[in-house]
Structures are given as structure tokens and as C-alpha cells.
């Protein structure tokens, strides 16, 4: 009889639980003033004026890891830095799902990379659609729990705030899912848009639920999308496994440097001011859109975007394109046959967007 208490590592693929991964030249802390261990060039490239790029970078830069952990409210050992949230999603699927066997649960309409990563791993995808009612879109928590249990899903992805619909999941509902699926699935909460939300982060719940995983990114509120810095926040043992599954040198030195500068106290103060402005503009833009005759519905949003249904989404889309305004066409997504997603821009950009849509109304049919 096995009386050993289950751990989060029991959810990892068995062959990876003791997987050592690749041991790179930077995997072990070494000291010395003459480094001849990684077959790097002895001279900098002529384009490298500061002579800082000839060495391989730190796999997990300690300073940046500490800054991100402080930002998100965890300890560094609970945080893995990756190339955007996309890499975190991919690592989780590869580490947890046995190909052709272990399902991944998603809640469409939702960010497509969860299903894409699952399909690349040949993991079955279980879909539990969001419910669209008078209050907007929301997660069907009882259906999520039932589907996860019935299918024996190993990963449950919850996007909160959800892209593209903008809805956030209340903490109490996430905790209900965590309580019910303890020991059977990792519950992954994607908080890419968390800075714009009224709902607090779920990171503090990690102390009680080691099967919780949180995804964060510097791409949205922190305006560093090109830098490609995302974080997986999870049980330290799981983070160690994911690191072994990760590429040896995932983080380019220039990206790390920009991220560290972007997380300085001064930069964080500017970011907070901009987030507040986006939240205010989100309300202004939403109210103005709702007054347009061609707009069928503007959904409440906890992100930096608005999902909008149009009487004629094609006409709205083409008018915006003709005016040089690019928005996201969502009509191929489940339940969104008439919807466009509009990013909240600066006040001037939002006013320009509204002017184009108002002009459509002025054109005789």
C-alpha cells in the first residue's frame, strides 16, 4: 500500500520527473578570470561596441528573476522566465501531457496558443465554451469541473482576464476549481492582462494550492512586447522541471537588460500611470461605442481592449482598414461571428477610431 502524499510532480510525465536536461556552460556557477569552457569567440563582434555580447547569457538571470518575483509576489524559486507566455504554455504542455493521452481543457472563445500547443503535443483538446448572457461572457465553472474530471484533463487553462472577451474570473470561482481538481490537474491561470483588472492576482493562492500555475508577461501593461519576457509562477519543484525542459539559453542579453530597466522604480511608476489612463479610456471608448447605431454590443472588459459586436462587422472592418486603423477580426472564433476586438489606445487614437466608425453611420445605405 502506497501511503506517500501526492505532490505536484505526480502530474508531470513520469519519464521527466528525474530528467536532468541539458547541462550548458552556464548551468553551473564557476569562478575564474579566463573562461575557455563554452567555445565562445575570444574577440567581440565589430558591431558590439560595448563588448558585452560574445558570451552566452545567464539561463535565468538572477537580478531579473528577483525583480519579477518581487513584482508578482512570489519567491524567485517559484518563477521561471521564458520567451513570452507562449513558451510557458508550451513547456507546461510538453512537461505534463503524454502525447495522444493526456487532455488539455480550454474555454473558447479564448487565446489560441493553448490549443495550438496541445495539438503540437498530440494532446486531446477539451472545449468548455464561455457562457454569453446579459452580464457578458463568463466561465462555466460547473461545466469546467465536470469536463475536467470526466476527461481526466491534466491541464486546465483559465484566461483571466480572458482574451478576446475581456472577462475576469472571480477568485472564489478559481479556488473552487482548484479545490475540486487537486491531485488530478494543473490549473493554469493566464494573467497576461492582470494589471488592467479589478480582480486581484491568484498568485497568493499558490501557498495553498501547489497545482496552481500563473502566467504573467511584460508584453502588455509594461509595453515590452518585442522583448519577449514572460513568467511562469508555480511550485518550485515544478519550476525546476520546466527549466530542464527549456532551451539552454532562452533569454538574449539585450532583452534582459531592457526588461531590468523597464522594472525600475521610475519605470514602474510610469507604467502604473499609463495603466490608469488605459482603464479610464476603456470606459470612455466603451460608452462612446455603445452609442453608435451600427454597434450591437460592447462587452465589459477587464483588459486593455474591448470586444464589440457590429450589425455589419465587415463594413466596419473595411472602413477602419481604409482609414489606416488596424483592429483584430474575431469573426472566425466560436460565438463571435459579428465581433471585432479593439485595443484601447491613447486618447487621440481612440478618438480617431470613433471618428471612422461615426462616419460609417453618416454614409447613406
Curated annotation (Swiss-Prot):
Cofactors, names only: pyridoxal 5'-phosphate
The protein's assembly and partners: Homodimer.
Gene Ontology molecular function: any one: histidinol-phosphate transaminase activity
Residue list for modification N6-(pyridoxal phosphate)lysine: 220
InterPro entries listed in its UniProt record: Aminotransferase_I/II_large, HisP_aminotrans, PyrdxlP-dep_Trfase, PyrdxlP-dep_Trfase_major, PyrdxlP-dep_Trfase_small
This protein's record includes keyword Amino-acid biosynthesis: yes
Keywords, alphabetical: Amino-acid biosynthesis, Aminotransferase, Histidine biosynthesis, Pyridoxal phosphate, Transferase
EC id: 2.6.1.9
Gene encoding the protein: hisC
Top EC class, one word: transferase
Catalysed reactions, as listed in the record: L-histidinol phosphate + 2-oxoglutarate = 3-(imidazol-4-yl)-2-oxopropyl phosphate + L-glutamate
An individual GO BP term: L-histidine biosynthetic process
Family from the record: Belongs to the class-II pyridoxal-phosphate-dependent aminotransferase family. Histidinol-phosphate aminotransferase subfamily.
UniProt key word Protein biosynthesis: no
Pathway(s) annotated for this protein in UniProt: Amino-acid biosynthesis; L-histidine biosynthesis; L-histidine from 5-phospho-alpha-D-ribose 1-diphosphate: step 7/9
Protein name, as recorded: Histidinol-phosphate aminotransferase
Amino acid at each position: 500500500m502506497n501511503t506517500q502524499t501526492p505532490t505536484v510532480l505526480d502530474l508531470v510525465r513520469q519519464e521527466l520527473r528525474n530528467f536532468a536536461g541539458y547541462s550548458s556552460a552556464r548551468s553551473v556557477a564557476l569562478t575564474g578570470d579566463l573562461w575557455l569552457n563554452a567555445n565562445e569567440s575570444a574577440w567581440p563582434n565589430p558591431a558590439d561596441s560595448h563588448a558585452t555580447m560574445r558570451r552566452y547569457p545567464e539561463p535565468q538571470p538572477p537580478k531579473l528573476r528577483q525583480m519579477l518575483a518581487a513584482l508578482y509576489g512570489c519567491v524567485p524559486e517559484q518563477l521561471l522566465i521564458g520567451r513570452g507566455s507562449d513558451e510557458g504554455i508550451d513547456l507546461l504542455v510538453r512537461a505534463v501531457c503524454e502525447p495522444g493521452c493526456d487532455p488539455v481543457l480550454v474555454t473558447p472563445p479564448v487565446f489560441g496558443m493553448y490549443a495550438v500547443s496541445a495539438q503540437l503535443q498530440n494532446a486531446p483538446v477539451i472545449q468548455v465554451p464561455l457562457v454569453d448572457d446579459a452580464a457578458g461572457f463568463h466561465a462555466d465553472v460547473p461545466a469546467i469541473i465536470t469536463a475536467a474530471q470526466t476527461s481526466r484533463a491534466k491541464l486546465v487553462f483559465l484566461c483571466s482576464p480572458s482574451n478576446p472577451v475581456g472577462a475576469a474570473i472571480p477568485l472564489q470561482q478559481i479556488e473552487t476549481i482548484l479545490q475540486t481538481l487537486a491531485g488530478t490537474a494543473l490549473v493554469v491561470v493566464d494573467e497576461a492582462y492582470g494589471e488592467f483588472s479589478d480582480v486581484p492576482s491568484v498568485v497568493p493562492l499558490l501557498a495553498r494550492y501547489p497545482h496552481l500555475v500563473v502566467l504573467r508577461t511584460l508584453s502588455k501593461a509594461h509595453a515590452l512586447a518585442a522583448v519577449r519576457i514572460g513568467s511562469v509562477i508555480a511550485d518550485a519543484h515544478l519550476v525546476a522541471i520546466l527549466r530542464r525542459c527549456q532551451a539552454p539559453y532562452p533569454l538574449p542579453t539585450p532583452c534582459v537588460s531592457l526588461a531590468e530597466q523597464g522594472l525600475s522604480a521610475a519605470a514602474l511608476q510610469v507604467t502604473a500611470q499609463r495603466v490608469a489612463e488605459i482603464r479610464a479610456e476603456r470606459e470612455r471608448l466603451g460608452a462612446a461605442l455603445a452609442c453608435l447605431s451600427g454597434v450591437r454590443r460592447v462587452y465589459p472588459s477587464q483588459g486593455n481592449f474591448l470586444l464589440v459586436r457590429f450589425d455589419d462587422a465587415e463594413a466596419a472592418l473595411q472602413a477602419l482598414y481604409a482609414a489606416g486603423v488596424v483592429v483584430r477580426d474575431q469573426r472566425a472564433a466560436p460565438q463571435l461571428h459579428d465581433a471585432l476586438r479593439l485595443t484601447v489606445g491613447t486618447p487621440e487614437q481612440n478618438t480617431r477610431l470613433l471618428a471612422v466608425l461615426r462616419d460609417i453611420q453618416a454614409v447613406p445605405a
